[in-house]
């Protein structure tokens, strides 16, 4: 009788272990790590970028698209060279310089160097700085500008 009780107890413990293991595997949650935030140093190095939208030329909105290469220095400065097409004309080798500011929540703003004729942008940093998604905040143009780390 004692042997039968011991055998039953061992079987019950083994079955409980198997069920617990199966339930734990089936319903396990993904590991989530705390985000450490962003800073100007999040953006460093070369990024390819493209922009698309509309530019106001002589009180008429015309398509304005382009692409280029930008370099972020990790300290709040960015310089770029780009090509664009607007309203049937195109241009290459155009410079753009700006300062940028990054908040700890990964919001970013780019402010064109005064007198450069460039636009200002606001947006967000995603994937630990691998991408930057922005929109033009300089009236009256409507552009999206997206960067991808090279």
Whereabouts are the PLM-identified features?
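Bacterial N-terminal signal peptides
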Residues: 10-24
